[in-house]
Amino acid sequence: MYALFLLASLLGAALAGPVLGLKECTRGSAVWCQNVKTASDCGAVKHCLQTVWNKPTVKSLPCDICKDVVTAAGDMLKDNATEEEILVYLEKTCDWLPKPNMSASCKEIVDSYLPVILDIIKGEMSRPGEVCSALNLCESLQKHLAELNHQKQLESNKIPELDMTEVVAPFMANIPLLLYPQDGPRSKPQPKDNGDVCQDCIQMVTDIQTAVRTNSTFVQALVEHVKEECDRLGPGMADICKNYISQYSEIAIQMMMHMQPKEICALVGFCDEVKEMPMQTLVPAKVASKNVIPALELVEPIKKHEVPAKSDVYCEVCEFLVKEVTKLIDNNKTEKEILDAFDKMCSKLPKSLSEECQEVVDTYGSSILSILLEEVSPELVCSMLHLCSGTRLPALTVHVTQPKDGGFCEVCKKLVGYLDRNLEKNSTKQEILAALEKGCSFLPDPYQKQCDQFVAEYEPVLIEILVEVMDPSFVCLKIGACPSAHKPLLGTEKCIWGPSYWCQNTETAAQCNAVEHCKRHVWN
């Protein structure tokens, strides 16, 4: 795609390179039609006028000035003005251009190629835009829009939602012709051999996807190889083929990495069409907590992990810490300075609360900071950590296979880190789900299989948490993928654990005097 930016640059950039030789002139109109200089050196002025320079252009100051000048120069030719007079007029016009390097380049090309320019003006008096495109002072509208689209993708960290068929199909549909050119117009397509062609295609696409992930130079080599195949299409089609590959190869490869090999092969006709599978219905949070996360292996009886609400003491301590951390953040303190200040915060509380404060700091200190740095409202932090009841999030009860020694911890952090970098704040559950399904393919090979297992096991509970916060350490600790350095804080009475305990059944609800609460907020 960098070639497109170079081809769309103005006159100064066009003159920066050496004089074209025979080898460069064999590369087609992408090289010939950069400007009058390259077209003249390659003997392709007429071709460029008929196929490239006659396309719509972008409205700009250099382009408008150029059109006025060309029109005036045409009138001067009608009045039998000499070449010297027109040269002086054109050079004076170059001085009007806004940038010094553009003005100098304009004068150089006018001095060197005046006869060619005059011939173009004589033949295209009614279309000054074509002459200005030849001078590279009017930019192609098609190239300009392509650059804007590419720049927009670079500036956004959101995973694009593109129409796969619209983007990939034209590029991929040409692959059979490139790899297996036809001998003549009467040749017949080769028949498929009982699905062998489909399997070969799937294997080829799989190998390509693997190579793209593991070999940084493979993509460029692949594009160059396909361009070489374009030469087999003959002089007329070869240039069109190469230009097409240059324009669409990058986005086609990007989309190919998001598709299954069989989908791609069906798209280009090597495999039967893949039937669409309906997406699995998302289960509400309160239902997702029971028997929806499959165990990967048989293990000893699994204990039920609950995140209980804490007593009022822990709630008050948490709210105090949140206020202190918020003040430090507002004063532009660094993360390290804030973490170092946690112990001093506890000294501000009465001695009767120092032990509880230290427990909260040790267990939840980094999580409090991470959540606040995500610009979450301070009033919600302690509820999210289940240290305060009331408006807190419903506790999630999950049954998971315990990985040995935190086996999923590293892959969890890498995946959540990927989501944090590529998803915008306030992303919907659907956007998070789509990103989860694609995220594993972007991790290094050693993590991909483990990542797929991790997503299959943790997906429901992971989505619920990612809607609120995307800090890798906090999320992976919260869902149990990473082991905690401290035991969670528990109250002395089970009823202070909150709704996660109250609403287990009618007996516990009655025991904690919470039947009405459970009916309104949990059992409905």
UniProtKB/Swiss-Prot annotation:
Disulfide bonds join C63-C138, C66-C132, C94-C106, C198-C271, C201-C265, C230-C241, C315-C388, C318-C382, C346-C357, C409-C482, C412-C476, C440-C451. Keywords: Disease variant, Disulfide bond, Gangliosidosis, Gaucher disease, Glycoprotein, Leukodystrophy, Lipid metabolism, Lysosome, Metachromatic leukodystrophy, Neurodegeneration, Parkinson disease, Parkinsonism, Repeat, Secreted, Signal, Sphingolipid metabolism. The lysosomal precursor is proteolytically processed to 4 small peptides, which are similar to each other and are sphingolipid hydrolase activator proteins. Residues 18-58, 488-524 form the Saposin A-type domain. Glycans are attached at N80, N101, N215, N332, N426. Saposin-B co-purifies with 1 molecule of phosphatidylethanolamine. This is Prosaposin. It comes from Homo sapiens. The lineage of its organism: Eukaryota, Metazoa, Chordata, Craniata, Vertebrata. The gene is PSAP.
